[in-house]
Amino acid sequence: MLRRIPLLTCILLVGALSCHAGRAQACTHDNKVERSYLFSDQGRLYDSDPEPTANSSIALTLRACRGDLTAARIEYYDTADASFHRIPMHWVSDDPTGTFDYWQGTVPASRSKKGYRFRVTDGSSTAWLNAAGITSREPSSGDFLIIPGFKTPDWMKNGVMYQIFPDRFYDGDTSNDVTNGQYRYAGCATERHAWGTSVFPKVKGCRTEVFFGGDLAGIDQKLGYIKGTVGADIIYLNPIFMSPSNHKYDTQNYYRVDPAFGTAATLQHLIADIHGSSNGPPGHVILDGVFNHSGDSSCWFGKETYGSISCPEPGAFQSQSSPYYRYYTFQSWPDTYSSFFGFGGMPKLDYGASGSAMRRQIYASKTSVMQTYLRPPYRIDGWRLDVAQSLDADGRDGSDATNHEIMRELRAAVTSVNPDAEILGEFWGDAAAWLDDGKEWDGAMNYNGFTRPISEWICGEDETGKSASINESTLDRRLRASRADLPVGVQETMTNALGTHDTERFATRCGGDIRKVYLGLIFQLTYLGTPAIYYGDEYGMQGGPDPDDRRTFDWSRANTGDAAVALTHKLVSIRGRYSALRTGSYVTLLTDDTRHIYAFGRLDAAHRIAVVLNNASATQTATVPAYQLSMTNGSPVTDLLTGQTYRVSNGNLTVSIEGHYGAILSQ
């Protein structure tokens, strides 16, 4: 239903009740648009329906300096007629501080995709505002997006993810542990290492055959820690299907849980316990889908064997008459074939044309891999797609029309089983091409828009450990740019990790400084998107490049007696209590390149929150513009981390923040 705000009545704006019958002048009609006051985004305060249906008209709100604008309008491009449309906006209210005016206009309902910006004038002065920022010239990109009928899962928006590399988390069933020399694969014998010892192999070049015994039963037994102590309610598991390696990214059989991790029954029990409430709030589970390539031990390929695995038919490597021959691309059979980054042990799957056997095998049929685990008796809640941009045909490496066709088909297949399932793509760059039309992924692993810039700002290194340092202004520009081309529902489900199984550990990049880990955790749990905690990051686990970023979990740290774990628990709890931190608007408040302070606001109809981050080593005071959040003078504001209360004075908040720490100031 369209939300309308009457002119001379009590209104709810930015979380405060305000009654005004007139407009006090804060600015003047001086032929100069006051840009620092302009704001809008697709939070619920400024967009009446961020994820509309085709039947929903959308009331859009713009904030400006009080008394500044002489006119405002919405300009939107409609893909239905490939034309721009212009909608005049009208003044609807001012705010409790007497600082801002609010203007509103309505985009009519339709089923077509649209992009919009605001055009504002003060006499002879004109400016435009869109998702990319404010300009004096009409922008050519970065418009806010409206995609009727596209909705990302609310459980992703409101949840906290916990990523687990199964072999290194907890050994819950010693009977399935891989032993020394249990089998050989690609010339390497398996090595059984004791928990807490080195992840590096005793035999050079055999790192993928080092095992510690972690399994699905172990994860099940530790759900109380994950759901309760940490507070996470979305569990993302690195690959669990049958494979000769410890990482399982070289799948042998997609329909069988690896024996070292358990059985189909073990997986079903784990999923039921994640969904249940016996170990904490009901949760969700996402499996890792490695569908760009298989392992060379797959019965589909048949180059390598291990253990007692036998295949009923020859694989593509063994015979050109194999029923699986077209599952792969050979340049010169059998030895030259397309593979993942040239790794012969990971032959690339060939998706062929629409309707191909490969597409039916992976996603398009009821018995396909993806649909099998979405359906009973498993009922997983989503898939993370490994190297998702690369799925393709004829040995091509993706990011092309065929890849997008595959992803559209894949989405249709997944949502036909569960419309609320998550499709999470792995991509290290700007993933907008898969996210800006609502027909492919719901979100992506946010390396580009969170992991990398936050690491460079706090640690002075990128996610790989390479030296790279940015200041607060650059940080803010990169964060804004990464959000600008994404629908708001996607922004709210991008997974924000400090590190993953493919990066150096955050604590290691930060030189082992636990204070910087604290700062990273505060940023992660208050930023826009789904926080994704890689197991051990909650206590500052260290580790260099693969395989050192996959150390075993230190269970002596797994309690709130550990300061970092206690902070993580508190931050997750705060995020759960304050919807503004999950789906509220995001506004930059301060970028201090000299004192290394960055502040932003999160706000919705219930709360206004200022997050202030101190990236210097010493305690500092910071003054942030509370008026930007419509906090009134004299009103109290509480730091949710310390419990300390401050008061707004002259439109500002002045707070003291310890080195490499933050404040979460709520009203």
Tell me what each language-model feature is.
Residues M1-T9:
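Bacterial N-terminal signal peptides that target proteins for export
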Residues A64-R66, D78, S93, V107-A109, ...:
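Short, flexible loop/turn elements at secondary-structure junctions
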Residues L8-S18:
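Bacterial N-terminal signal peptides
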Residues P6, H20-F165, D171, D177-N180, ...:
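Carbohydrate-interacting/catalytic domains
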Residues L69-A72, L270-I286, N292-G315, S319, ...:
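Active-site-proximal helices and loops of the catalytic beta/alpha 8
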Residues D68, V160, G231, D250, ...:
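Short loop/turn motifs at secondary-structure junctions
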Residues P166-Y378, L410-S416, A433-W434, S455:
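Substrate-binding/active-site clefts of carbohydrate-active enzymes
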Residues V160-Y162, I235-L237, V285-L287, W383, ...:
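Hydrophobic faces of well-ordered beta-strands that scaffold small-molecule active sites
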